[in-house]
Amino acid sequence: MKRTYQPSKLVRKRRHGFRARMATAGGRKVIAARRARGRKRLSA
């Protein structure tokens, strides 16, 4: 059985990137929560 994590920069950006987050209401909440917490990195 192969490992489940097969890294890909493109897939990572598309699924978890800033623009992907901003595209949905829930994603915008995630960014807002991370901003409020003072996270250095907001998204992938």
Curated annotation (Swiss-Prot):
GO MF annotation, one: structural constituent of ribosome
PROSITE patterns: RIBOSOMAL_L34 (PS00784)
Lineage: Bacteria, Pseudomonadati, Pseudomonadota, Alphaproteobacteria, Hyphomicrobiales
Record-given protein name: Large ribosomal subunit protein bL34
GO BP terms: translation
Family matches, as InterPro entries: Ribosomal_bL34, Ribosomal_bL34_CS
Gene field: rpmH
This protein's UniProt keywords: Ribonucleoprotein, Ribosomal protein
Domain of life: Bacteria
Keyword Acetylation: no
Cysteines joined through disulfide linkages: none
A GO cellular-component term linked to this record: ribonucleoprotein complex
Similarity comment: family membership: Belongs to the bacterial ribosomal protein bL34 family.
